[in-house]
């Protein structure tokens, strides 16, 4: 693994990486393509065969200006010359509209919708969650099956459905796809569980948008033991979209206990960022700009049965 400073590197780095992969015998590459990458032409010249659309939620409005503009930049990938398969989350309103557009405008493209809804081609028919993972049953054009995963959250069930759609569309057998997906381990810092018998369950997640925080909290509320409390320790980044700060605060109120602290303030004063969050948090919250102090407070105050996000 090599560290990268951007989700999608600059065009020279992208082409260099692909060249090196091919020289080493790689036949397939999975790439996360950011809206910035599409807008700044970082992936021009890349021959994409299949693409997944996961969601459109508030982020990067300091760059794109509006949700509509943000969505249309993401949609560019699905009009890529030579693209053969589009696998789209139709539980997402923009995704559902995009799938409809593509079916009408691109008869050459195989479009598969995935999600919990009845209209999904790759449909999640059953979902059961626990603190150590989840069980997901799927009905697909390639058959039905079930996968037991160590991942957490309905959004990760959707992600598994997306992987099934992309891989099966490319000719991989459903049973082998499900067996492979069962082996996936959570990425560090993404619903990453820290468990000790004498301490509360601590879950570390990257959630830096209102939607992501809302989904992380909903996931943990589903698995929280009866009588236990869910603590949310969070902050917002500096020198980025200020409009999402009160939305993050509002999302955090779905937890039982809220702790507000710093999260990469960059060049802004940490307390100024916190002051932008606080008006949306009606319940009493513990506030401390020092992140270590805030985390230590939550761990010290939580019971063994509690969960800390």
Named regions from a protein language model:
Residues 84, 228, 306:
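Glycine-centered, small-residue-biased loops immediately flanking beta-strands
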